[in-house]
Design a protein with these regions (language model features):
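Sensory-domain cores of signal-transduction modules, predominantly PAS/LOV
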Residues: 7, 18, 47-52, 118
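PAS/LOV and related PAS-like sensory modules
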Residues: 32-56, 159-167
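Per-ARNT-Sim (PAS) sensory domains and their PAS-associated C-terminal
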Residues: 95, 99, 109-136, 142-146
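PAS and related sensory helical modules
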Residues: 62, 69-90, 97-98, 102
Length: 167
């Protein structure tokens, strides 16, 4: 049974569809990679991200990781949801909102699964933070079409990567 278990995990590391016979040396340290839960990854990933419904009229926020909450000054998800009415568009500065939404949907409409925008993100205290936004649209079995969006603080990027991207 232990040998079959080892072969099964080796196959899982290379995709879902496949089979193989056990052979010596399959017990690798790679097996540990399968043990990361979503919460472990989302809370320790060095990047801010959110997940929201990919719909022009109903852009409901589903999730924001702790890095996003910290960056934008929200105490917790409840405060984020309350102050934004659970809408992605309410994170975008009002005078930029229409242009940013149009840009996202034009990029997606051109057959891309990724979009790239730059805007001012509304923080919990009402101030704004200039951010870079990299979104990806995916089909979720549970929620339908959703966006996974990574955010980077433009000023932090400039400070930490100024040598890599000279002015």
């Amino acid at each position: 049974m232990r040998c079959a278990d080892g072969a099964l995990y080796e196959i899982k590391l290379h995709g879902k569809n496949g089979c193989m016979a056990y052979r010596e040396g399959l017990q690798s340290g790679a097996r540990k990679q399968l043990g990361f839960a979503f919460k472990d990854v989302s809370e320790h990933l060095p990047g801010a991200f959110i997940i929201y419904r990919a719909h022009k009229e109903d852009d409901e926020l589903f999730y924001a990781n702790s890095e996003f909450l910290r960056m934008a000054g929200y105490k917790d998800l409840d405060e984020l949801f309350r102050l934004t009415q659970k809408r992605f568009r309410n994170l975008i500065r009002e005078d930029e909102r229409q242009q940013m939404e149009q840009s996202i949907w034009e990029q997606i409409g051109d057959g891309n699964e990724n979009d790239y925008i730059r805007f001012h993100l509304r923080k919990a205290d009402g101030t704004y933070l200039s951010v870079l936004d990299h979104g990806r649209i995916v089909d979720s079995q549970q929620y339908g079409r959703v966006f996974y969006v990574l955010f980077a603080d433009r000023e932090e990027m400039r400070l930490h990567y100024s040598e890599q991207f000279p002015q």
